[in-house]
């Protein structure tokens, strides 16, 4: 296939340009299209949809093994998408893929995720967008995740997804032979039970490390976090529209004008 006829794929993440997951994802996407990598210069996990205001953003080329790999932006994942579209890319991408994140982005974690936010920013800009996350924080093996990401990206390029919608994909950190299956799921319900650890600096002033445990509030295989814990790959459609449409009709009956 002529290089210019291949789909143009924008690759981003929130773990930063040196994160292993983005290198696996970029390599996988290069098998099906033209890849441009634009990622934060430093890790920005948990930044959600934050963007940089009042501070200049800087773009730099990034070398990997003495070869050009992509661009870094001195900002958040959302900054990367905005800057890529306005100052780096010559043509609009056919698809945006974000990840592969180090750690799951299911249930409540979806709201904190810079990986998911980068994909949502892509959708806001009218780009078909996917987010990929590996459900582990240690001993990560991105092999199957990269393979599945490529398979799903090809399917999405063929089938399309609705406007203002992304697919958030969470992949168990197990060998392919142990994957239980692939499920389309909804965003699960959970909350973090916080345990802020207090310590003192050398001057005796207290400081805090945020810590906690994710408490699952449902136990259905149609919810992403529960399914991932049982070795299912989950594919969850998320919308840029945060409106609770179910409650909106009831709210209209409140007669708020009086």
From Swiss-Prot:
Keywords: Cytoplasm, Hydrolase, Metal-binding, Nucleotide-binding. A divalent metal cation binds at residues 14-15, 45, 101. Binds 1 divalent metal cation per subunit. It is found in: Cytoplasm. It comes from the Bacteria. Signal peptide: none annotated. Its cofactor is a divalent metal cation. The keyword Nucleotide-binding applies. It catalyses: a ribonucleoside 5'-phosphate + H2O = a ribonucleoside + phosphate. GO terms for cellular component: cytoplasm. PANTHER family: 5'-NUCLEOTIDASE SURE, 5'_3'-NUCLEOTIDASE SURE. Belongs to the SurE nucleotidase family. HAMAP family: SurE. This is 5'-nucleotidase SurE.
